[in-house]
């Protein structure tokens, strides 16, 4: 299955950015200059820059663990290590056993691939408002026990009750590093046919944040461990992969990302990492929806796929992400992919600027 995924990614990205067989929609045949052969085309330059992204001969996670000599509370508590204790689940009474099982299945799939991190408790909300209030209180007692009343009346407790009021099937994760002992959790509303995928997505956030600790490196204001686009993009990519929906999702996401770039040429994933830019984007609509959502999910997924295509699925999730604990987000990215985050932003912007037909026939899907 992993081989099939990588083959699909390679084929997909080659069709979009590297194939000489795909014709431009709007481009006019360029005039050949006398020294044309001496000047690499923009496409050739892009291909060479993409090749810069590669697996490096850096120290393994085991070497980094052995060399890490800075006292760290979360590392000493095993925050970044798999646990034997199984996740717990709380569910409102109006939901069925099938709803519970779909969420349990998603978490099980996530832990099977990534390992069992936590301690984790999952809260599943239906449409009964009184039931949601009960589970909201339970959530606050677990995840915000240092400030339960505030959580219930002014913070996430309200969000949980609103899931019942509006019958939302969204989710959110909470990472309570500051508690003694620390714990993790996520909340899901009204499980439907996408429940398994959503549960995996939220569990990926649990895994990501298990490797983000309070250390010297994240005292830097601009180093949050994972850029927003990579945090959401990598969660969605792995969730789609594990439920077998990556091909269609990648094709759709690339279309959306390219249209977004065409209509908003001065907006990119790098703007998500600037707080002032982020506040502006949160008030702006793009492609009929929120700019931030498109950049984090569809565009972030394509960017993540490009990194995975140049390395591997296991390398991305099981080598790169764990290194964040010991190196911080910026250094872990650079060490893992042979390129800085800012350099990747430049390459990815050029990738989206390529004006090619992007398509993938159903016949080719079936053949793969």
Task: List each language-model region with its residue ranges.
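C-terminal motif of bacterial Sec signal peptides marking the signal peptidase cleavage site
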Residues: 16-17
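Solvent-exposed, acidic/flexible segments
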Residues: 92, 96-103, 188-200, 210, ...
């Amino acid at each position: 299955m992993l081989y099939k995924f990588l083959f699909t990614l390679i084929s997909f990205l080659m069709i979009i950015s590297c194939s000489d067989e795909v014709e431009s929609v709007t481009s006019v045949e360029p005039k050949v200059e006398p020294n044309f052969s001496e000047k690499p085309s923009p496409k050739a330059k892009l291909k060479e820059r993409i090749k810069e992204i590669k697996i490096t001969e850096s120290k393994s996670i085991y070497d980094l663990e052995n060399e890490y000599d800075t006292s760290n509370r979360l590392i000493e508590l095993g925050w970044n290590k798999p646990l034997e204790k199984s996740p717990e689940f709380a569910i409102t009474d109006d939901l069925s056993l099938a709803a519970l099982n779909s969420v349990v299945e998603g978490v099980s799939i996530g832990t099977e691939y990534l390992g069992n991190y936590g301690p984790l408790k999952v809260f599943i909300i239906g449409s009964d408002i009184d039931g949601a209030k009960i589970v909201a209180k339970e959530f606050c007692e677990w995840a915000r026990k240092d400030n339960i009343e505030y959580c219930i009346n002014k913070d996430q407790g309200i969000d949980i009750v609103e899931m019942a009021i509006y019958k939302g099937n969204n989710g959110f994760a909470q990472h309570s590093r500051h508690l003694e002992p620390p714990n993790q959790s996520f909340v899901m509303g009204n499980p439907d046919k996408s429940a398994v995928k959503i549960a995996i997505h939220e569990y990926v956030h649990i895994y990501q944040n298990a490797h983000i600790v309070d250390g010297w490196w994240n005292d830097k204001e601009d180093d949050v461990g994972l850029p927003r686009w990579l945090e959401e993009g990598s969660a969605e990519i792995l969730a789609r992969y594990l439920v077998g929906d990556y091909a269609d999702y990648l094709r759709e996401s690339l279309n959306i990302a390219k249209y977004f770039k065409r209509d908003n040429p001065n907006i990119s994933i790098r703007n998500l990492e600037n707080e002032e830019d982020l506040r502006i984007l949160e008030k702006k609509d793009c492609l009929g929806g929120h700019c931030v959502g498109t950049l984090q999910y569809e565009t972030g997924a394509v960017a993540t796929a490009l990194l995975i295509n140049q390395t591997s699925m296991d390398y991305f999730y099981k080598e790169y992400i764990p290194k964040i604990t010991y190196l911080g987000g910026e250094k872990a990215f650079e060490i893992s992919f042979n390129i800085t985050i800012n350099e990747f932003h430049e390459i990815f912007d050029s990738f989206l600027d390529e004006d090619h037909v992007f398509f993938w026939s159903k016949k080719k899907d079936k053949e793969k």
